[in-house]
Amino acid sequence: MPSPADLKNIGLKATVPRLKILEIFQTSEQRHLSAEDVYRILLNEHMDIGLATVYRVLTQFEQAGLLSRNNFESGKAIFELNEGKHHDHLVCLDCGRVEEFFDADIEQRQQSIARERGFALQEHALSLYGNCTKDDCPHRPRR
């Protein structure tokens, strides 16, 4: 996981907002966070860090390779720690919850399809969208 020293190594000062936002991504039970999610966590912890600062820090972390940005169907950017391991996403259309998964068969099939069509696959992103089917889903909005 990135540390304050890592911030300095990539040319970013280890400021309180940067350290706190980095800590949120390292310790949050939820791996996929929007700027608004981060801001809400900061407010709940009584941190005086504005939403504009959150956006700026998230962009800096993305540019530095600490975070990855995903733009799912909701249209808002969702960030996660860039730990270098490829994975795909399942996205709930009801609440926006994101789950990661890795499936070697899917990865192989994508490579095979690319080769069959004359492509050497360099990178890809797969996001599957659906509705949770669990009756007791804790993430489903109450109706």
Swiss-Prot record:
Instruction: Name the domain of life.
Output: Bacteria
What Gene Ontology cellular component terms go with this record? cytosol
Key words, A-Z: Cytoplasm, DNA-binding, Iron, Metal-binding, Repressor, Transcription, Transcription regulation, Zinc
Positions of the UniProt region annotated as Dimerization: 84-143
Q: Where is this region: DNA-binding?
A: 1-83
Under InterPro entries, the record lists: FUR, Fur_C, WH-like_DNA-bd_sf, WH_DNA-bd_sf
Which residues are noted in the entry as Fe cation-binding? 86, 88, 107, 124
Q: Where in the cell is it found?
A: Cytoplasm
Residues that coordinate or bind Zn(2+):
32, 80, 89, 92, 95, 100
Self-association and partners: Homodimer.
Task: Describe the function of this protein.
Answer: Acts as a global negative controlling element, employing Fe(2+) as a cofactor to bind the operator of the repressed genes. Regulator for biosynthesis of the siderophore alcaligin E.
Q: Which family does it belong to?
A: Belongs to the Fur family.
Q: What is this protein called?
A: Ferric uptake regulation protein
- The species this protein was found in: Cupriavidus metallidurans (strain ATCC 43123 / DSM 2839 / NBRC 102507 / CH34) (Ralstonia metallidurans)
